[in-house]
Amino acid sequence: MTKKKSSGGALIAQNKKARHLYELLEFFEAGIALAGTEVKSLRAGQVSFTDSYVTIHNNEAWIVGMHIAPYANAGYVQHDPDRDRKLLLHAREIDTLRARVEQKGLTVVPVKLYFKNSRVKLEIAVGRGKKLHDKRQDIKQRDVERETRREIMRH
């Protein structure tokens, strides 16, 4: 009897820095066009996209700055680790992203990378850069919440 594959998304990587640096406003799920060795490297968790962002050229969305390490067992045929990768989105989603990016101060950043039904998906978000005082305010708010949870646990 064969085991049924779980349809749940296995998290590959998460961009924690994006939530710290940006106020995330709107989220999208995008497929990503990859080579076979890139998928094998992702299964091994060898990816970094902390400084990456999404651009739109010729009605196509591309992720720039995502590093997928070369697959160790691939031999002499390897992928370029730092190449721009095409995102698979519907045309209306690309139009929405273009409209948001043309607004002043908004950018599109990757948030997390995961498997969904054995396909690699990338969650991207439209975000506005936080100012220093916004970051400090978030840290203060987090500390207050932590203290209230501690007090509740004590009593």
Curated annotation (Swiss-Prot):
<dbReference type="InterPro" id="IPR020081">
    <property type="entry name" value="SsrA-bd_prot_CS"/>
</dbReference>
<comment type="similarity">
    <text>Belongs to the SmpB family.</text>
</comment>
<dbReference type="GO" id="GO:0070929">
    <property type="term" value="P:trans-translation"/>
</dbReference>
<dbReference type="InterPro" id="IPR023620">
    <property type="entry name" value="SmpB"/>
</dbReference>
<feature type="region of interest" description="Disordered">
    <location>
        <begin position="135"/>
        <end position="155"/>
    </location>
</feature>
<dbReference type="GO" id="GO:0003723">
    <property type="term" value="F:RNA binding"/>
</dbReference>
<dbReference type="Pfam" id="PF01668">
    <property type="entry name" value="SmpB"/>
</dbReference>
<keyword id="KW-0694">RNA-binding</keyword>
<comment type="function">
    <text>Required for rescue of stalled ribosomes mediated by trans-translation. Binds to transfer-messenger RNA (tmRNA), required for stable association of tmRNA with ribosomes. tmRNA and SmpB together mimic tRNA shape, replacing the anticodon stem-loop with SmpB. tmRNA is encoded by the ssrA gene; the 2 termini fold to resemble tRNA(Ala) and it encodes a 'tag peptide', a short internal open reading frame. During trans-translation Ala-aminoacylated tmRNA acts like a tRNA, entering the A-site of stalled ribosomes, displacing the stalled mRNA.</text>
</comment>
<dbReference type="GO" id="GO:0005829">
    <property type="term" value="C:cytosol"/>
</dbReference>
<protein>
    <recommendedName>
        <fullName>SsrA-binding protein</fullName>
    </recommendedName>
</protein>
<dbReference type="InterPro" id="IPR000037">
    <property type="entry name" value="SsrA-bd_prot"/>
</dbReference>
<keyword id="KW-0963">Cytoplasm</keyword>
